């Protein structure tokens, strides 16, 4: 999605995009006699979401935010707590130092960036070619590591749009059981 579409709320929903992608792939599947699996990403939070997208022809659904709040996730409890505390209005579209938009939980780091404060990187790993350490407002590598470690002040806590619906810890088995039950009912 383009950043402006995300900020203005005009990005096409996956329910509109998926049929278009499947239609574009159909001639190639026929020509080469091979199935080309399509996975949707973004918006697959519940079992009902999973069943809906699978029913529309998706081979699968990438899930992320929901799995952060599981016992098995290796992120710190601080990151998990940030996910569990977040409400819908806490989600911001940020312009990352790598030049792409992303959804993140509003945190002190984002507040500082919105106020125009720059946190010059203390070191550079050279991880992204498009990042200029002399100009970047903050080091995304540092901010992501701080988030995984649970540092609320310095972390960049990426999340999905529906993070406000994730309000309790669970296990991966519980999440997958919910998805399987929803798929079995369709």
Feature locations, PLM:
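Conserved active-site-proximal phosphate/metal-binding subdomains
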Residues: 1-39, 45-186
């Amino acid at each position: 999605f383009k950043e402006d579409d995300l900020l203005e709320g005009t990005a096409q929903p996956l329910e509109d995009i998926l049929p278009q992608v499947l239609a574009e792939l159909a001639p190639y599947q026929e020509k080469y006699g091979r199935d080309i699996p399509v996975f949707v990403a973004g918006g697959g939070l519940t079992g009902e979401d999973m069943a809906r997208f699978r029913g529309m022809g998706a081979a699968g659904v990438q899930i992320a935010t929901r799995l952060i709040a599981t016992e098995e996730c290796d992120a710190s409890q601080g990151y998990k707590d940030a996910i569990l505390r977040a409400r819908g209005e806490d989600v911001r579209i940020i312009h990352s130092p790598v030049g792409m938009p992303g959804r993140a939980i509003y945190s002190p780091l984002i507040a500082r960036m919105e106020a125009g404060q720059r946190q010059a990187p203390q070191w550079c790993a050279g991880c992204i070619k498009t990042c200029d350490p002399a100009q970047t407002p903050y080091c995304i590598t540092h901010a992501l590591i701080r988030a995984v470690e649970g540092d609320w002040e310095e972390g960049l806590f990426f999340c999905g749009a529906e993070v406000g619906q994730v309000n309790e810890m669970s296990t991966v088995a519980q999440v997958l059981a919910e998805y399987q039950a929803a798929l079995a009912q369709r």
